[in-house]
Amino acid sequence: MAKPDNRNDNVEKLQEMVQDTIENLEEAHETLQNNSLSRDQRQAIMEKNKRREESIRSFRNEIKDEYQDLH
C-alpha cells in the first residue's frame, strides 16, 4: 500500500534542496577558478550551473505554492 501524501514537511525538504543546490553552485564557481580545466570542462560546469540556477528558481516557486496551500 502506498504511503499517504504528507505535505507538512514539503517546504522544509524544498528549502534543504535549495540550500544543497546553492552549495553545489558555489563549489562549482570555485572549481571554475582552476586554470587547468579544459574549455569543454569549463563549458560543462557553466551549463550545469545554469541548470542549478533554474532549479533554485523552481524550488523557490514550489516553496511559495506549498506555503500558500498550508495557510
UniProtKB/Swiss-Prot annotation:
InterPro entries, sorted: SASP_thioredoxin-like
Annotated stretches, region: Disordered: 30-56
Ranges annotated as biased composition (Basic and acidic residues): 39-56
A matching Pfam family: Tlp
Family indicated by similarity: Belongs to the Tlp family.
Designated name of the protein: Protein Tlp homolog
Organism of origin: Desulforamulus reducens (strain ATCC BAA-1160 / DSM 100696 / MI-1) (Desulfotomaculum reducens)
The encoding gene: tlp
